[in-house]
Amino acid sequence: MYDFDYIARSDGWLTSYNAAGLHGAVPVPGVSYAEAYFGKQNGRFINYWESDDSYDFGLKTESFRRFEKVSFYGKMQYRYFRGQHMSGSILLNPGDRPFDLVEFTPGTKTREQYILSGGVGFLLTKKLTGGLRIDYEADNYAKRKDLRHSNTMMDLNLSAGFVYRFAAVELGANYLYRKNTERVLCEQIGTTGENYDMFFNKGVWFGEKGLWTGNGMHLNEPGISGLPMKDSEQGAALQIAFR
């Protein structure tokens, strides 16, 4: 009896973005798993945007299914994170962009993450299979102390490809498309009269530091509410497998 991870690692096509490789690679009629998890993290050996006292929990399920002419992969996941004493970057994934926005008042932050993935590989001829795959993620992120921020992010990955099987060699090719959007809103709700600084990091900690006054710092400019960010990518990949 094999567990899910063992089967997922048994063939490179099962973890490839080219879902055409699914058909012919799933070694069993079907396998699934579901889990609930909880984690607790404490310690000061952290990066400037991380928490020294946090926890997270979530639910996750994955599945492979094989039929005569079609095979499927699916995944659903939910994750909740709560961290204390957090400041630093106000972006969801610092390091993914060529700039950063940094604030300096520690507070509690929460993040909710939703992930949905699916792939299908189908037989076109005896030697040729096609495939489609989608990976979708949505995140909400918020700080609950001034200077407060709230983020929404969407990450979408699409792939379409094929695999041609020779006697001892499999050749694959697929097209990749990715779209990522994130929007950040900042606000000050408290009436203590305290002033809050922000730093716009343009790279390797060169940039501009300013006093938050309800606008500026690229977060609330004339005609723009919040900081909208958008990335679009297209690409292609080739695969070869020897049997």
What are these regions (language model features)?
Residues 32-40, 74-80, 132-138, 173-179:
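Transmembrane beta-barrel strands of outer-membrane/channel proteins
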Residues 67-70, 123-127, 165-167:
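Outer-membrane beta-barrel channels and translocator barrels
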